[in-house]
């Protein structure tokens, strides 16, 4: 698959449209699950296996503010590539 500019902007718009605020203020803090679910859908459509993992070290999580990590893998050989990024916004 060759990446294209319209495809990039479509995904960028979709990511920006999903709220994922991390805040010490409990009134603002929300889950990043909508972003993780979207990314998993995109990766799975491209042949990746995805695993959602609860983020360690976060206290007092409820379903409304649960923080998740996404691990997407493809292939089984030695070596590989790791990409890491944030899926939340901080006010």
In which residue ranges do the predicted regions lie?
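Acidic/His- and Gly-rich active-site-bordering loop/insert found
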Residues: 2-91
């Amino acid at each position: 698959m060759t990446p294209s500019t319209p495809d990039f902007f479509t995904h960028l718009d979709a990511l920006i449209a999903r709220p994922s605020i991390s805040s010490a203020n409990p009134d603002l803090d929300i889950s990043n699950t909508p972003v993780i679910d979207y990314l998993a859908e995109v990766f799975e459509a491209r042949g990746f296996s995805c695993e959602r993992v609860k983020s360690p070290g976060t206290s007092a999580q409820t379903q409304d503010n649960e923080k998740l990590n996404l691990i997407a893998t493809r292939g089984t050989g030695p070596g590989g590539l790791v990409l890491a990024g944030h899926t939340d916004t901080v006010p």
